[in-house]
Curated annotation (Swiss-Prot):
Species this protein is from: Mus musculus
Entry annotated with the keyword Ubl conjugation: yes
PTM section of the record: Phosphorylated. Phosphorylated by RPS6KA1 at Ser-334 upon phorbol 12-myristate 13-acetate (PMA) treatment; this phosphorylation results in dissociation of the CCR4-NOT deadenylase complex and induces p38 MAPK-mediated stabilization of the low-density lipoprotein receptor LDLR mRNA. Phosphorylated by protein kinase AKT1 at Ser-92 and Ser-203 in response to insulin; these phosphorylations stabilize ZFP36L1, increase the association with 14-3-3 proteins and mediate ARE-containing mRNA stabilization. AKT1-mediated phosphorylation at Ser-92 does not impair ARE-containing RNA-binding. Ubiquitinated. Ubiquitination leads to proteasomal degradation, a process inhibited by phosphorylations at Ser-90, Ser-92 and Ser-203.
Low complexity composition-biased segments: 305-318
Biological process annotations from GO: 3'-UTR-mediated mRNA destabilization; apoptotic process; cell population proliferation; cellular response to cAMP; cellular response to epidermal growth factor stimulus; cellular response to fibroblast growth factor stimulus; cellular response to glucocorticoid stimulus; cellular response to hypoxia
Compositionally biased tracts (Basic and acidic residues): 82-96
Cellular component GO terms, alphabetical: cytoplasm; cytosol; nucleus; P-body; ribonucleoprotein complex
Tissue: Expressed in preadipocytes and adipocytes. Expressed in the proximal and distal tubules in the renal cortex (at protein level). Expressed in ovary, heart, kidney, lung, spleen and thymus. Weakly expressed in brain, liver and testis. Expressed in osteoblasts. Expressed in embryonic stem cells (ESCs). Expressed through B lymphocyte development.
Necessary and sufficient for the association with mRNA decay enzymes and mRNA decay activation: annotated span: 1-111
Subunit structure: Associates with the cytoplasmic CCR4-NOT deadenylase and RNA exosome complexes to trigger ARE-containing mRNA deadenylation and decay processes. Interacts with CNOT1. Interacts (via N-terminus) with CNOT6. Interacts with CNOT7; this interaction is inhibited in response to phorbol 12-myristate 13-acetate (PMA) treatment in a p38 MAPK-dependent manner. Interacts with DCP1A. Interacts (via N-terminus) with DCP2. Interacts (via N-terminus) with EXOSC2. Interacts with XRN1. Interacts (via phosphorylated form) with YWHAB; this interaction occurs in a protein kinase AKT1-dependent manner.
Polar residues bias locations: 101-113
Zinc finger motifs (C3H1-type), residue ranges: 114-142, 152-180
Localization of this protein: Nucleus; Cytoplasm; Cytoplasmic granule; Cytoplasm, P-body
Gene behind the chain: Zfp36l1
Protein name: mRNA decay activator protein ZFP36L1
């Protein structure tokens, strides 16, 4: 009986020494240590005395796996990051998990779209703010930023305000509450509408755009009017004070240049001036406005139409027909009848 007690005491002593060695050096595990670990889990000792205080080391399971892998001939697994984490006792696992989350807000701060868009009230009233440079409001006009609004901002009435007379958003509401906001919006629209627009003084052909605009507006104002605009002669256009000099206007051409440009395409004689041909009345243009030949029975109608058109063009001229002012087609037809 005495021998059994002595052997149990020696066994406990050796187990404590083995645990101390393992705590100092984890790199040299032994098979005996694994057996002692199994005893430490809760198995009874040799004399049948159960251990009251059993301690489970975090690396005991790792040593068991390493022993089994060595017996099977497999390479021993290396220490994982989780097992090596318990070696460092400077901070716990929970502190390590909270450490990166505490660094994130300080590293990068995401500002809202309203950052520094309003003045700081404590700074304006007292001249100081407890937040300092970290304040979300502007400390002075130089820090104030312009707020980007939606295109439909303050363009519709606030239904809540005009229904119950109260809006929880107050001045931050995106809809119109009173007439002052409507007037402010209208003033902003007037400023945007008063911006100067690009105006082209002359078109490519050299005609003033103001005259064309006036003619277009005149036609739009009187849509039932069929009176054509007055035909301007070349001398009137060239002598108009609205036209710039030839040196300043890159699209100004002389009569000789116009003759060289339009003579091949229009079949004009070399000595004739194209400007006088271009601005001749319709009744005096022999080749451009020739009508197709018509039957003999409709000559009276055409002559009547010719007389009415010539009287409307001449104005104060007599309604009698002149053979020199008649179109060539009617002249030929009258000659054939004779």
């Amino acid at each position: 009986m005495t021998t059994t007690l002595v052997s149990a005491t020696i066994f406990d002593l050796s187990e404590v020494l083995c645990k101390g060695n393992k705590m100092l050096n984890y790199s040299t595990p032994s098979a005996g240590g694994c057996l002692l670990d199994r005893k430490a889990v809760g198995t009874p000792a040799g004399g049948g005395f159960p251990r009251r205080h059993s301690v489970t080391l975090p690396s005991s399971k790792f040593h068991q796996n390493q022993l089994l892998s060595s017996l099977k001939g497999e390479p021993a697994p290396s220490l994982s990051s989780r097992d090596s984490r318990f070696r460092d006792r400077s901070f716990s696992e929970g502190g390590e998990r909270l450490l990166p989350t505490q660094k994130q807000p300080g590293s990068g701060q995401v500002n809202s779209s309203r950052y520094k868009t309003e003045l700081c009230r404590p700074f304006e009233e007292n001249g100081a703010c407890k937040y300092g440079d970290k304040c979300q409001f502007a400390h002075g006009i130089h820090e104030l930023r312009s707020l980007t609004r939606h295109p439909k901002y303050k363009t519709e009435l606030c239904r809540t305000f005009h229904t119950i007379g109260f809006c929880p958003y107050g001045p931050r509401c995106h809809f119109i509450h009173n007439a002052e906001e409507r007037r402010a919006l209208a003033g902003g629209r007037d400023l945007s509408a008063d911006r100067p627009r690009l105006q082209h003084s002359f078109s490519f052909a050299g005609f003033p755009s103001a005259a064309a605009t006036a003619a277009a507006t005149g036609l739009l104002d009187s849509p039932t009017s069929i009176t054509p605009p007055p035909i301007l002669s070349a001398d009137d256009l060239l002598g108009s004070p609205t036209l710039p000099d030839g040196t300043n206007n890159p699209f100004a051409f002389s009569s000789q240049e116009l003759a060289s440009l339009f003579a091949p395409s229009m079949g004009l004689p070399g000595g004739g001036s194209p400007t006088t041909f271009l601005f001749r009345p319709m009744s005096e243009s022999p080749h451009m406005f020739d009508s197709p030949p018509s039957p003999q029975d409709s000559l009276s109608d055409h002559e009547g139409y010719l007389s009415s058109s010539s009287s409307s063009h001449s104005g104060s001229d007599s309604p009698t027909l002149d053979n020199s002012r008649r179109l060539p087609i009617f002249s030929r037809l009258s000659i054939s009848d004779d």
